[in-house]
Swiss-Prot record:
Organism, as annotated: Escherichia coli (strain K12)
Lineage: Bacteria, Pseudomonadati, Pseudomonadota, Gammaproteobacteria, Enterobacterales
PROSITE patterns in alphabetical order: HTH_ICLR, ICLR_ED
Protein's gene: mhpR
Domain HTH iclR-type: 12-74
Top-rank taxon, per record: Bacteria
Disulphides: none
InterPro entries attached to this UniProt entry: GAF-like_dom_sf (IPR029016), HTH_MetabolicPath_Reg (IPR050707), Tscrpt_reg_IclR_C (IPR014757), Tscrpt_reg_IclR_N (IPR005471), WH-like_DNA-bd_sf (IPR036388), WH_DNA-bd_sf (IPR036390)
Molecular function in Gene Ontology: DNA binding; DNA-binding transcription factor activity
Name of this chain's protein: DNA-binding transcriptional activator MhpR
Assigned keywords, A-Z: Activator, Aromatic hydrocarbons catabolism, DNA-binding, Transcription, Transcription regulation
One Pfam family, short name: HTH_IclR
């Protein structure tokens, strides 16, 4: 699984340079002159000025009338405000799942809650030689039938869990029957919390040949997603899968959590103390 895919078109040099200047201005408290930016970037002063004037015209930088330096404007915050948790998770998880695939061989998915189901945001199914599905991104995984769904229910806040179960229980059909059996469901969720992972062994009607284990992804003491490992049920039991692969899943989950936390701190820092003058 590669971090950077080959593209059909050449890199737009002007865009690359403009982004480089934005990054430099963010690191230089109090702004920077054309000369300093030219020195740091290695670009000609005329090129730097032209790029800055373009960014100024678009509203991302402004020129200080007092010392002729350039500084970021508040508009740059808009570049990250539309980036939701699931997008951070997907971006951070992709390279980590690639490394995980080489270790566990079986495919893994990162999913997040979408109303009444878990939605796959990132996956290694298309890269795993043991995968039985190639197109998984965007697929909805039922909460009561999959390891990821049960993991979410097990580790989410109690009030959230109660509301989700009530919603599922109100729906007709066998897919939601478990929500109408509170003692049975709570035993399943309690076991997941005790063992640190959720499980599914041939429990999903649409995928009767598969089994899976999943661990929660947390940020600021809340569940933001789940990381699962999917395999052919005939290959091993849940206990064997956990013994063999749970440590790797937990390690990668922690790495994803640390990445999300770092991004959250970075975004918060930019919002509260970004070098906007």
């Amino acid at each position: 699984m590669q971090n950077n895919e080959q593209t059909e078109y050449k890199t737009v040099r002007g865009l690359t340079r403009g982004l480089m200047l934005l990054n430099m201005l963010n690191k230089l408290d109090g702004g920077a002159s054309v000369g300093l930016l030219a020195e740091l970037s290695g670009l000609h002063r005329t090129t730097v000025r032209r790029l800055l004037e373009t960014l100024q015209e678009e509203g991302y930088v402004r020129r200080s009338p007092s010392d002729d330096s350039f500084r970021l404007t508040i508009k740059v915050r808009q570049l990250s405000e539309g980036f939701r948790d699931e997008q951070w998770i997907s971006a951070l998880a992709a390279p980590l799942l690639g490394d995980l695939l080489r270790e566990v061989v079986w495919p893994t998915d990162v999913s997040t809650l979408d109303v009444d189901a878990m939605v796959v945001r990132e996956t290694t199914h298309r890269f795993s030689r043991l995968s039985f599905h190639r197109a998984m991104v965007g697929r909805r995984l039922p909460l009561l039938k999959t390891a990821s769904g049960l993991t979410w229910l097990a580790f989410c806040p109690e009030q959230d869990r109660k509301e989700l179960i009530e919603m599922l229980a109100s729906r007709p059909g066998d897919d939601y029957q478990l929500a109408r059996e509170p003692l049975k469901l709570e035993a399943i969720l309690a076991r997941a919390r005790k063992e640190g992972y959720g499980q599914n062994y041939r429990g999903w009607d649409q995928e009767e040949k598969i089994a899976s284990i999943a661990v929660p992804l947390r940020s600021e003491q809340r569940v933001i997603g789940c990381l699962n490992l999917v395999y052919m049920a005939s290959a091993m039991t849940i206990e064997q899968a956990a013994e063999k692969h749970l440590p790797a899943l937990q390690r990668v989950a922690k790495q994803i959590e640390e990445g999300v936390e770092s991004q959250a701190i970075l975004v918060a820092g930019r919002r509260s103390g970004m070098h906007l003058r």
